[in-house]
Amino acid sequence: MVKAVAVLSSSEGVSGTIFFSQEGDGPTTVTGNVSGLKPGLHGFHVHALGDTTNGCMSTGPHFNPAGKEHGAPGDDNRHAGDLGNITVGEDGTASFTITDKQIPLTGANSVIGRAVVVHGDPDDLGKGGHELSKSTGNAGGRVACGIIGLQG
C-alpha cells in the first residue's frame, strides 16, 4: 500500500487535508475534509506541478499526461487530474471519498509531487459550452491547494 497526503493552504481561509492510498496497481482512493468554502459544488483537480511559489497559480494546468480534453471523472476523454466536484454543505465543509484509476501514486504518471487544487466554482465537466469548458471546466479561481507528498 502506497499512501500520500496533501495539506491545503489558502489565502482565502480555506483549509483541509487530502489523503491518497493505492494498493498495488489498483485505483487510487482519495479521501478529504475541507472547510472554509462557500456551499455548493467546487471543482477538484490534480494539477501538473507541485509548485506553490506563487500560491495556487504556479501549480500549472490540470495533470494531463495523455494530452486529452477536460472532462468528467467517468469520461474516456478527460485529463487524468479531472476529479470532478466536491460538495460543500451549508456549514462550509466537505468530506468526500473519490476512487480513480488515472491518478496513480507510483510509476511514470504518479501524482506524487504534483498539486491538488480546490476551485471557487463548479466544474462543468467539459459540457458547459463556455470557452474554458474543454480546458478547465470553467471552475473559477484556485481557492486552495496542496502538494501531494509521500507518506510513510
From Swiss-Prot:
This is Superoxide dismutase [Cu-Zn]. Belongs to the Cu-Zn superoxide dismutase family. Homodimer. The keyword Electron transport does not apply. It comes from the Eukaryota. Zn(2+) binds at residues 62, 70, 79, 82. It holds the Pfam family Sod_Cu. The keyword Phosphoprotein does not apply. Cu cation binds at residues 45, 47, 62, 119.
